[in-house]
Amino acid sequence: MSIELINDECGNTQNKYFYFINCSDMEKELCNMEMKSIFKQIPNRKFLFSNKDFNPSRSPFIKFKVNIIYIEESLEIIINKIKNEKISYDDFKVNYMKSEDGDVSYENRLKAVREIGFVINGFPDIHNPKVELAIIKIKDKWIFGELIKNDFKWQKHNDKPHSYSNAIPLRMARALVNIATCDDKRLSIIDPCCGVGTVVIEALDLGFNIKGYEISKPIACNARNNIEFFGYNREIITSGDMHNIRERYDVAIVDIPYGLY
C-alpha cells in the first residue's frame, strides 16, 4: 500500500475506525472474503480503515479495533491536542500497537506510551484498566484512540464434547457466518448438513437465528449435545433429511460430507 493511499485513508473523516487483521497465508482468501462482506473492501495490508463500527470479537481475523480520536503527522501534535482538549480517563492504560508498517523502535514505543499517559487527565491502571488506549504509527501518520481487542472467547467452542476430524474448522465456520450474512442479523440461516454443529454454534454465538439438520441420528444427537453444552436449545438441531425441509430461510451454509454416505 502506497504512502499516498494511506494518507488518503487517514485523511478521510468518514473513517472513524482502524482495524488490524491477522491471518495465515492459507487463510488469506477466506479473510479477504470476510472483510469484503463486513466492510465492502479487501485490505491490501494487515489493516483497514472504515466508517463501520464492528466488534472485533465477531471475527476470527480482526485482532483489534481502534476508535480513532486523532490522526496526525507527529506524536507531538497528538500530545498537544490531548493537553489542549483535556482528554480524561480514569483507570486507563496506553498501549503501543505494532502495525508492521513503518513501525518505530522499542525505545520510541515506550517513550510514546509514557508521554501520552503523562498528559491524559486521570489515573492509570496498568493491571486492571477500565479503558485501553492505543497509539499506532502507519507510515508517516500517527493514530490515537480507544482500543478494543478481540477477546477470543469464541475459541472455547473448540472444547465442545463431540468433535470429528472431518468437521469444518472453528475459524472457518465463524468466518463463513460473517461472509454469508454480511453482518445482517435480520437474516435466518439453515445448515442442512450440520454435522456436530460447528457452524450452528458460531451463528448462535453471533446472535443469528439458525436451524441445523443432520441426516445421521447419532451425529445429530452429538450436535444437540454440543449446542446444549454452550447453553443453547438442543431442539435447534433436527435429525432428518435436508430434502424434507419445508421452511424458507434467507441463507444456507452447506458443507456437504463428501464420501461419508
Predicted regions and their residues:
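Short acidic low-complexity segments
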Residues: 122-129, 240-245
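Short loop/turn segments at strand-loop or loop-helix junctions that form parts
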Residues: 95-99, 147, 254-257
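Conserved S-adenosyl-L-methionine
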Residues: 168-246
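S-adenosylmethionine
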Residues: 238-261
